[in-house]
Amino acid sequence: GYSSAASDVYKRQLVDADYSQIELRVLASMAEDQTMIDAFNSGADIHTATAAQVFGLPPEMITPQLRSRAKAVNFGIVYGIGAFSLAKDIGVSNKEAKEYIDSYMHTYQGVAAYMQRMIDAAKDTGYATTLFGRRRYLPELAASNHMLRAFGERVARNMPIQGTAADIIKIAMVRVDRRLYAEEMESRLILQVHDELIVEAPEAEADRALQIVTEEMEHACNMAVLLRADGKIGQTWYDAH
């Protein structure tokens, strides 16, 4: 469960904002995949939209079970898992899982091409890189061992996505911190956990702090897909979730 870490100094509140599906938004933008970009920017639910495409059904016919399968495919692509792992995760046969992945790659052809470009570029240079130029060297790509090479290819595909998302949250942290100081507020950024930021705010500042955190997170990087941050205010971290 979540920590009930409380904040009771001078009746302070915790303001918590987290990115909505940042890695998939980064993927759509970096891959310049118009189908996925349009789905995000139209406000559609990306997992339902993916399910409709992969299973060949209209969105209104997508059941929670189909949506959750599509969600596993979406994140499976980001984390570079293959048909075998996907099959285990969602309880289908390897053959069916492979069909889902193939159908996904057919739907989001920009993503498929991008993944291949990332592998080729990493083989060429010896490293994978984020949108901001941070590198991860991949000697595994030149290994004679097949398992090591496969690992290197997986990292070459997903490090640019996960790494860029990690870069963006760090940029957001700097922006939030600067803005709170610039507006002479007492609120302070106290914690970053994965894709969320937590600010401790005096009660009177909480609403404004929430507005600042979400604004700065959403403007941390200018990409083809708009970033979205959802925030809440609470007495404890648990409440603010």
Residue positions per predicted region:
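Single conserved hydrophobic/aromatic residue that forms the stacking wall/gate
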Residues: 1-6, 10
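Conserved nucleotide-binding/hydrolysis micro-motifs of P-loop NTPases
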Residues: 20-22, 196, 236-238
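Conserved catalytic core of nucleic-acid polymerases
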Residues: 52-185, 191-192, 202, 232-241
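Short active-site loop/helix that positions an aromatic residue
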Residues: 20-32
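Cytochrome P450 catalytic domain signature, combining two hallmark sequence patches
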Residues: 31-41
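Hydrophobic (often cysteine-bearing) scaffold residues that line and stabilize catalytic clefts
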Residues: 2, 23, 43, 47, ...
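Short hydrophobic beta-strand that contains or immediately precedes a catalytic carboxylate
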Residues: 14-18
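C-terminal structured "cap/appendage" subdomains that terminate the fold
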Residues: 176-230
